[in-house]
């Protein structure tokens, strides 16, 4: 369950659904959707969506130019390899997503501890109020 103290956009971008065969992770970002069986794969796809969108908006090329190859008197065009800058940006995005998710887990743990402490405090306060003598203000 999402707590309003820790909810963020990453909850919409990386969703977990329970299915009879196990968890299903869904990466949704920039009009693209990918369903995965592992969290690691979903994080990589989410980073791929985000990095691709950033490169498209900035105008930087993601790949090297296409290469013409002559095979058996036929002209064949092969797509260029992915650029090193794109791969580095993708890896940075994966690291940042993992860091955000780790920080979110820590916040949720702290909120659970806080809620437990607060419930104990309220219970103890109610008990003290119930046993309060008449003359005490």
Q: Which residues does each predicted region cover?
A:
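Intrinsically disordered, low-complexity linkers and terminal regions
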Residues: 1-137
């Amino acid at each position: 369950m999402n707590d309003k103290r820790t909810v963020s956009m990453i909850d919409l971008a990386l969703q977990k659904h329970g299915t009879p065969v196990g968890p299903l992770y869904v990466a949704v970002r920039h009009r693209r959707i990918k369903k995965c069986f592992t969290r690691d794969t979903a994080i990589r796809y989410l980073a791929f969506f985000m990095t691709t969108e950033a490169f498209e908006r900035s105008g930087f090329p993601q790949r090297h130019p296409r290469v013409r190859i002559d095979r058996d008197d036929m002209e064949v065009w092969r797509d260029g390899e992915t650029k090193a800058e794109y791969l580095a940006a993708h890896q940075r995005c994966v690291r940042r997503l993992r860091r955000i998710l780790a920080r979110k887990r820590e916040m949720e743990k702290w909120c659970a501890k806080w809620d437990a402490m607060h419930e104990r405090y309220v219970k103890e306060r109610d008990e003290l109020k119930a046993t309060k003598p008449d003359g005490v203000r």
